[in-house]
Every structure is written in C-alpha cells, then in structure tokens.
C-alpha cells in the first residue's frame, strides 16, 4: 500500500474512533458539550473533551471520566490509537 493510502486509512480509523468516543460521552452525559479533535500533542493521535453542565456532582464527573478512559484504553489495545479523553470544567472554555 502506498504511504498516502496508509495515511488515509489511519485517518479514517481515527475519525471513526473519535466519533465513537464522542457519541459514548453523549450517552454518558447527554447535557454535556463534547468536542473531538485530531490535533496532535506529543504522542497522542486525538482527543475528546467533555464539558458537563455546571453543577454536576463530582462523583458523576468521575464516573464519566472513568468510563471514557476505559473505552479509550480498549481502543488503544485494539488499534494502537492513543486518544486522550478529559472531563473539563465548563467555565474554563
């Protein structure tokens, strides 16, 4: 396979997994704002940032973060894609 075809295949897989994680985040917290990005930092392939609504309980925030981290780890094991997921303070946007 030519290098461009390999790169296109990698990008298509990355886009699919970012979409999967973003949809999963919305399932976990429908009221959250979710942003997915392919901007690379260091060794990561992409990132998903979740901004829950103000006033969410800390335990709920942690539940969302742990579920996303587990799914991201599973994706890494299956594909080698390193996608960072974070639940962030909505006022920090």
Summary of predicted features, one role per range:
Residues 73-93:
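A short amphipathic beta-strand at an alpha->beta junction
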Residues 17-21, 61-71:
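Well-ordered, non-membrane alpha-helical segments in soluble/globular domains
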Residues 16-30:
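Short amphipathic alpha-helix segments
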Residues 46-66:
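A short interface-forming secondary-structure element
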């Amino acid at each position: 396979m030519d290098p461009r075809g390999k790169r296109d295949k990698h990008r298509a897989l990355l886009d699919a997994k970012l979409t999967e994680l973003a949809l999963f985040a919305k399932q976990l917290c429908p009221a959250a704002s979710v942003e997915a990005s392919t901007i690379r930092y260091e060794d990561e392939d992409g990132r998903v940032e979740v901004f829950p609504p103000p006033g969410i309980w800390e335990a709920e925030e942690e539940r969302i973060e742990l579920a996303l981290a587990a799914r991201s780890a599973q994706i890494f094991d299956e594909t080698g894609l390193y996608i960072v997921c974070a639940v962030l303070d909505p006022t920090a946007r």
